[in-house]
C-alpha cells in the first residue's frame, strides 16, 4: 500500500498535506513483490493499491492534483514486469498522458519538473546541490536575485556559496521553463557552514544557512524523535564575540511536533570546560499551543568571547491526554 496524500515533489512548492514524500519516481520505482517473500507468494498477488486520504483537500480539484499523474505510475507498476521498466520511456509516455489530462480540463501536478535542493556545510562553504527527477530537464540558475532564464548559467555541479545571497533556479526543456522557480535565500552568520557535533546525522542542517518551511518534513528541519534530551556543539573554528544565540523551532500541533521545555547554552574556548551562558524555559501552555508556526528563540549571551557553543534541549515528555495525539 502507498499513500498519495504524501508530498509528490519538493515540498517548498507543494500545498500543505501530510508529512513525507511519495514522488512520481518513488511510485514508479516501487516493487510490490518484496525481496523477503517466498517464491510462491508472488503469484498470489492480486494487484497494487494506493490510498488517498482527503483531510487536506477542500475541493475535487485538490484531489485531482494529488492523484494525477501519479495514478499513471501506479498503473505502470501493476502491469509492467520490473525488468522491463524504463524511466526515460515512461516519461515520454507521461508527456502524452499529461496532454490528455490538459485537454480534459483535469488539474494535475507538474511537480516532476520542480527542483529539490540540498545545502550542506563543507570546507567552510555551503555546497548547494540541485536535482530534478526528469533527466531531460536542464537546470539554470542566478545568484543576483534575478529570475533564471534559458541563457542563465547551466547547473552542472554543486555550487559553493560563501556569503549571503538569493539563489534562484528553474528547469528548462528546449529553452522553455517547465518547473516553478526555486528561490533559496542563503543567510550567513557566525555559525553558518561551521561544524556541528552531536548525535543526529542531520545536524548539519542547523548551520546550512537555509530556513525551514512550515512543512516540517521538508528536509530542512533537524528533528529528534523519542529523545527527551539532546545536545550538540557548534565549533566556530576561532574565538568570536557572541551577543545573541537564536534557533528556529517549528510547531505542528496536529503531528505532535513541539519545541522543548528548556534550551540551555554553554560556551567554551577549548571544547573541554563549558560555562553556562544562558537559557530559555517554556510552560506546558506555551509548548502545546495549537497551530502550525515557526518561532525564533533568542537567548542573550552578553557579548561573550567563545569558540564552542553547546546547545542542550530538554523535552517536556509525553503529550497530555487532551492533545490530538496524546502520549
List each language-model region with its residue ranges.
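Aromatic, loop-rich ligand-recognition surfaces of beta-strand-rich domains
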Residues: 214-278, 293-327
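Beta-sandwich strand segments
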Residues: 71, 177-179, 321-326
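Active-site lining segments that contact anionic ligands and/or coordinate catalytic metals
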Residues: 43-47, 125, 136, 156, ...
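Short, compositionally stereotyped local motifs that mark structural "simplifiers"
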Residues: 91-231, 250
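Solvent-exposed serine/threonine-rich low-complexity stretches and specific carbohydrate-binding patches
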Residues: 276-287
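Hydrophobic, well-ordered secondary-structure elements that form the walls
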Residues: 71, 141, 169, 245, ...
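Substrate-binding groove of N-acetylhexosamine-processing glycoside hydrolases
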Residues: 1-139, 187-199
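Short proline/glycine- and polar residue-rich coil/turn motifs
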Residues: 161, 285-291
Amino acid at each position: 500500500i502507498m499513500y498519495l496524500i504524501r508530498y509528490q515533489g519538493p515540498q517548498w512548492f507543494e500545498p500543505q498535506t501530510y508529512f513525507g514524500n511519495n514522488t512520481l519516481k518513488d511510485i514508479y520505482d516501487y516493487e510490490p513483490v518484496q525481496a523477503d517473500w517466498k517464491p510462491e507468494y508472488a503469484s498470489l498477488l492480486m494487484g497494487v493499491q494506493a490510498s488517498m486520504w482527503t483531510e487536506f483537500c477542500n475541493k475535487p480539484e485538490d484531489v485531482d492534483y494529488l492523484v494525477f499523474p501519479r495514478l499513471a505510475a501506479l498503473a505502470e507498476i501493476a502491469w509492467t514486469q520490473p525488468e522491463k521498466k524504463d524511466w526515460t520511456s515512461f516519461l515520454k509516455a507521461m508527456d502524452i498522458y499529461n496532454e490528455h489530462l490538459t485537454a480534459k480540463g483535469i488539474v494535475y501536478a507538474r511537480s516532476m519538473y520542480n527542483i529539490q535542493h540540498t545545502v550542506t556545510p563543507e570546507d567552510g562553504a555551503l555546497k548547494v546541490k540541485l536535482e530534478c527527477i526528469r533527466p531531460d530537464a536542464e537546470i539554470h540558475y542566478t545568484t543576483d536575485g534575478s529570475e533564471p532564464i534559458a541563457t542563465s548559467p547551466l547547473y552542472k555541479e554543486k555550487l559553493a556559496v560563501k556569503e549571503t545571497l538569493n539563489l534562484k533556479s528553474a528547469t528548462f526543456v528546449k529553452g522553455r521553463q517547465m518547473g516553478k522557480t526555486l528561490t533559496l535565500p542563503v543567510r550567513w552568520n557566525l555559525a553558518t557552514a561551521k561544524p556541528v557535533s552531536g548525535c543526529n546525522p542531520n545536524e548539519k542542517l542547523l548551520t546550512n544557512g537555509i530556513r525551514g518551511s512550515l512543512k516540517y518534513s521538508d528536509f530542512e528541519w533537524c528533528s529528534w524523535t523519542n529523545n527527551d534530551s539532546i545536545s550538540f556543539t557548534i565549533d566556530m573554528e576561532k574565538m568570536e564575540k557572541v551577543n545573541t544565540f537564536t534557533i528556529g523551532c517549528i510547531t505542528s500541533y496536529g503531528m505532535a511536533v513541539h519545541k522543548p521545555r528548556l534550551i540551555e547554552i554553554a560556551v567554551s574556548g577549548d571544547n573541554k570546560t563549558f560555562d553556562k551562558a544562558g537559557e530559555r524555559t517554556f510552560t506546558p501552555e506555551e509548548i502545546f499551543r495549537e497551530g502550525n508556526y515557526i518561532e525564533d528563540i533568542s537567548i542573550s549571551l552578553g557579548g561573550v568571547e567563545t569558540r564552542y557553543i553547546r546547545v542542550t534541549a530538554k523535552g517536556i515528555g509525553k503529550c497530555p491526554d487532551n492533545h490530538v495525539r496524546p502520549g
